[in-house]
Amino acid sequence: MAKAKFERNKPHVNVGTIGHVDHGKTTLTAAIATICAKTYGGEAKDYSQIDSAPEEKARGITINTSHVEYDSPIRHYAHVDCPGHADYVKNMITGAAQMDGAILVCAATDGPMPQTREHILLSRQVGVPYIVVFLNKCDLVDDEELLELVEMEVRELLSTYDFPGDDTPVIRGSALKALEGDAGQYGESSVLALVEALDTYIPEPERAIDKAFLMPIEDVFSISGRGTVVTGRVEAGIVKVGESVEIVGIRDTQTTTVTGVEMFRKLLDEGRAGENCGVLLRGTKREDVQRGQVLAKPGTIKPHTKFDAEVYVLSKEEGGRHTPFLNGYRPQFYFRTTDVTGAIQLKEGVEMVMPGDNVEMSVELIHPIAMDPGLRFAIREGGRTVGAGVVAKVTA
């Protein structure tokens, strides 16, 4: 059979495996890639290729992740798997591999374990929108009632963290049996059922270009006779000449009109997501705009000073702090293109945060920044990164 050629026209969805150590995340990843390649075309990867995860840098933090790709009948999936628990924490907080949905792997022999719970909490905090469950190692449990019990526990745990536990697809199977080509109920058919659950339960993500216009401002220029130009990379949506935009963050929100868009010194009618462009603003003075603000479609994003966040604190080995920090610590928070000083408040009962920890905290900034839940930031001290975080909830 000739190799199926890679189709770019299928919708692209990002997923990943989460769950407790040794519950079978990497084996399942290999099984999905292998069985999809066999059934729907594409290239298979074996367990050893996935397990030897290469190091990546995201915001100066070293993370080990493996990426595999596979096709279902209707989609192309990019799947991320991490070898160690710390890699998951870093990956999810930095957004190095954004997930449109996660596959929670839970061994039926163990039931939910500490990292099962922690990964569900992290998914909630960093805004992973959907979770599908694969109950693994079901071939090793001969009591149907025990399987029912474990499934119920997992569903309750999901509900605890505001995921719809009762409606979440739970697939029973054995990643190892599937990988070995087993034709029984827990073999290949369980993995195909999982892929079908991904296809139906995780909605197609909205593309950046279809979202509301947003462009972080990197630079501001004054062009004599033309006015003020702000430059940056369009993060989402499209901006057209003649449209109204808001300048949000740091100062009071201003509304202005786009009188020109240029890219590489050429005039355009519009700037689109992913493009670096200059936007000419009508009647805006050079001193009214600064780096760190954003241009946005009116009414779509608001400036805030207070938020709750999930933060990973770099270890000493990663170039982070050598000592813990306490309540009231005031570092710089780097959002998009600029640093803003903020004070942190730790949760009750937490005295200090050690390098290498991940922690929930509340932050109050000295200037407002345009933000929504899911926005990533770095924590810096004297120009070096000491942490990475994500906005879990805006509070003021």
UniProtKB/Swiss-Prot annotation:
Superkingdom classification of source: Bacteria
Chain residue ranges for the region called G4: 136-139
Binding site residues for GTP: 19-26, 81-85, 136-139
Every tr-type G domain range: 10-206
Taxonomic source organism: Acinetobacter baylyi (strain ATCC 33305 / BD413 / ADP1)
G3: annotated span: 81-84
Gene Ontology CC: cytosol
A single GO molecular function term of this UniProt record: GTPase activity
Chain positions recorded as Mg(2+) binding sites: T26
Keyword Phosphoprotein: no
Hydrolase in keyword set: yes
Keyword annotations of the record: Cytoplasm, Elongation factor, GTP-binding, Hydrolase, Magnesium, Metal-binding, Nucleotide-binding, Protein biosynthesis
Reported function: GTP hydrolase that promotes the GTP-dependent binding of aminoacyl-tRNA to the A-site of ribosomes during protein biosynthesis.
Full protein name: Elongation factor Tu
Region (G2): 60-64
Top-tier EC class: hydrolase
Region (G1): 19-26
Subcellular location: Cytoplasm
InterPro entries assigned: EF-Tu_GTP-bd, EF-Tu_GTPase, EFTu-like_2, EFTU_2, G_TR_CS, P-loop_NTPase, Small_GTP-bd, T_Tr_GTP-bd_dom
Gene: tuf1
Region entry G5, spans: 174-176
Enzyme Commission number(s) from the entry: 3.6.5.3
Assembly and binders: Monomer.
Pfam families found in the cross-reference section: GTP_EFTU, GTP_EFTU_D2, GTP_EFTU_D3
Catalytic reaction(s) noted: GTP + H2O = GDP + phosphate + H(+)
Main subcellular localisation: cytoplasm
NCBIfam families found in the cross-reference section: EF-Tu, PRK00049.1, PRK12735.1, PRK12736.1, small_GTP
Protein family according to the UniProt entry: Belongs to the TRAFAC class translation factor GTPase superfamily. Classic translation factor GTPase family. EF-Tu/EF-1A subfamily.
